[in-house]
Amino acid sequence: MTERELLQGYVSKPAIQNALRVIRFAEGTERGGPDSYRVMFGGSLAPDLKRHPDRAITGGGYTSTAAGAYQFLSPTWNEQAKALGLSDFSAQNQDLAATRLLRNRLMSIGGLSVLEKEGFSPRVSAALAPEWASLPTESGKSYYGQPVKKLSELQKIYGQAAQPASTAQQEPGKGQETSTGSFLQGFMSAMAGNQPKELSTTDLVKQELMARLLTPAPEIDPLDFLANMRPIG
C-alpha cells in the first residue's frame, strides 16, 4: 500500500476532518464551500484548481505565495504533490497534502493518533505551529510572530471544550479503571470465590500469565510506522 493510499484512508476520519477544519478556520479560508480551496494570500480567489497559482501577493506588510484551504506556500505544495503524485490543486488533493503535513508535524508527539487521544490540545497546536503561522505555540504566540488564533477558539471549532484534565489522561486507579484491570479483578475474584487466601508460587505464576494474556498489544498506526521507515544500507 502506498503512502497516498494510506492517507486516503485516514483523511475521512473524524479526528482528521476536525483538525483540517481548525486549520481552515485559523488560516481564514473556511467559507463553507469549494471557494475555501481557491483562497489566495490576501483573500482573492484563484481562477481554478488546475494547479497551485504560484503568485507572490503582497499585503499587510507580508509577501506570500500561500494559496488554497490550507494556505500552501508554492514550494511546500510542490514537495507534497511530488511525494504523493498529485496532478492538480483539487480540494481532495489539498486535503491529502494537508493530512501529510499534519502527520509529519505530529510525529514528534505520537503521530496522527494523538488527535484521537487528545483532540486539539496545547501540544498538538504547538507541534503544528511551525507549519501554520496562525496556530499558537504553547506560549500562545505565533511561531513566526504573526497574528494568531486563541487555543480556546480552535478547540471549540474542533468540537471540544478546553478542559484542565481529561479522563483519558488520568492514571489507572485515579478516577477510572482500565478494562483489562476490571476484567482481571473480576476473573481472579471468581476464581478465589471472593475469599482472600495466601497464594502459592504456582498461583502467582498463573496470575502473571493470565494478566499478560489479557493485556492488549499496543496499537500500531500504519501511517506512523511508514513515516518512520528508513531505507536499508
Task: Mark where each language-model region is.
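Cell-wall polysaccharide-cleaving catalytic domain and substrate-binding groove, primarily
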Residues: 1-87, 96-193, 199, 205, ...
